[in-house]
Every structure is written in structure tokens, then in C-alpha cells.
Amino acid sequence: MIETDMLYAHVKLKDWLKPTAEKLLRRIAQGEFGVVATSREVLHELYYVSMAEGVELDSYISRLAALTSIPNLSFRETTAEIDLLAATLMKQFRLSSIFDAYYAATALNAVADHTIISTDEVFDKVTGIRRIDPRNM
């Protein structure tokens, strides 16, 4: 599973993670990892981050179109179980971001290997999740 940091870096014009994101998403598009999951919540987080950065709505829509058209990237829907698990993970592991909690819950509930590709070390403290830093792939 891949979370927002790589996807957001991919759609931004400039980002310190953009070279890593471009390489990783090219590999995903080519099918090197099979189908890679992500949470549909990344689209919501992308909205809030984009608006906070002053991105125009048309640009946000273009970003969504770019992400949702990546071959071999599958957006996982949230479920009531994922919603409840996300809130529980926030409490149990003191996660401050609801989005990180959703990604962790999705990885635990809807991704067979419970792996998250992310630079965010917050996932290291969630029992059952294996984080892979994309800069090391």
C-alpha cells in the first residue's frame, strides 16, 4: 500500500520527494509490484493540503485525474470496520492525523501484507504494520 507522501509529491511541481515519487510511480505503472493499493482517503487529504497551499480547484481536479489514472494503483474504499479501526488506532498509538490513522487501518484491514510505502515514521509505532521507506527501494 502507498500513502499520501509519494502521491502528493508526484502531482506537485516541486517537492523534495518528487524524484523518489516519480521513480516509484513509474515502477507501479509498469506493473513491477502487481496492483498496489492506496486508501481513497488520500484524495480527501490531497484536497485539504492543496487548498491550504492555495491550489486552484481546477488544479486540484487535474491532480485527482492524474492520480486516479495511474495504472496498477487501486483505491480502496473505507468501510465501517476501517472507520472504527482508524479511531481506535488514533487512541491506542496516539496518532494525531486522522489520515494516517485511515492509512494504517486500511493497511491492517484491507491489505494482505500490512505494508505501507511511506517516508512517515509514524507507521513504525503501529503494531502489525511494516513500513518501507520509498527512498530505499
Where are the model-predicted features located?
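Acidic, PIN/NYN-like endoribonuclease modules and their adjacent C-terminal/linker elements
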Residues: A104-M137
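Alpha-helix C-capping/helix-to-loop hinge sites
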Residues: H10, G31, V49-E53, I70-S74, ...
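Short, well-structured N-terminal submotif of metal-dependent ribonuclease cores
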Residues: M1-T38, S50-S62, M137
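Short, conserved active-site loop motifs that form the nucleotide-linked donor/cofactor pocket
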Residues: G34, L73, I129
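Histidine- and aromatic-rich ligand-binding microenvironments
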Residues: E3, A37-S39, L95-S97, D120, ...
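Active-site neighborhoods of divalent-metal-dependent phosphate/nucleic-acid chemistry enzymes
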Residues: L73-T115
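A generic structural signal for short hydrophobic patches within well-formed alpha-helices
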Residues: L7, L43, F123-D124
